[in-house]
Amino acid sequence: MTTRIPEASLIRIVQSYYDAVDSMDADRLSSLYLPAPSTTLQFNADPPIVTVEAIKAFSAQLFQTVASIKHSMIEIWTNPLKGDVVPVDLPPPRSSSTVTVVSTALPTFSIRNASGVTSVALPATSIFTIDKQTKKFVSVHNMFDIAKLFAAVQSST
C-alpha cells in the first residue's frame, strides 16, 4: 500500500530539487533521484538521460559550463496530475506508487565571458514524478529554451 505525500512535503521535495540545482553540486542533486535503472532527467523533446549515474555526469558537466544558476518565481502545483494531463504512456510509467506534480520557475544562468558575466533567464516548466515511499525523483522533465543557454555558452568561448 502506498501513502499520500502531504502537500507541505511535496513542496519541500520540489524546493529541494531547485536548491540542489542552484548549489551546482552534482552529488547533492543526484542523491535526490531514486537509484533505479529507469530513473530519468529529460529536457524538452530530447531523449531522456537515464540512470542516476548518467544524470550526475550530465549535471557535473553543466555545472562546469555555467558560473551560477539561481531559480526564482517558483510555483508548485501539488495536486497529482491525471492521465489526461501527463501522458501515462511516456516513460517512466506513472503508477499508484508515484505522484506527479508540476512546477514553473525562472532559472537564471550566469555564464562567464570575455566581458564579464552574461545572465540568461529562461522561463521553465518542470514535471516531477516522485516515488511515494522514498520521496525521491523517478523522473524530472524540464521544458525551457535550452538552445538560448547553449548559444550564450558558445558566444562566451
Where in the sequence are the language-model features?
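A ubiquitous structural signal for well-ordered alpha-helices
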Residues: Y17, F58, L106-T108
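Hydrophobic beta-strand residues in large extracellular and virion-surface proteins
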Residues: V14-Y17, L29, I55, I76, ...
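A solvent-exposed, acidic/Ser-Thr-rich amphipathic alpha-helical stretch
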Residues: A26-T104
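Short beta-strand segments enriched in hydrophobic/aromatic residues
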Residues: Y33, A105-F109, F144
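Short, cysteine-centered beta-strand-loop-beta hairpins and adjacent loop/turn segments enriched
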Residues: Q64-S68, P107-A121, L149-F150
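Short, low-complexity N-terminal intrinsically disordered segments enriched in polar/charged residues
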Residues: M1-P35, L41
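Short beta-strand edge/turn micro-motifs at domain boundaries
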Residues: S96-T98, A121-T157
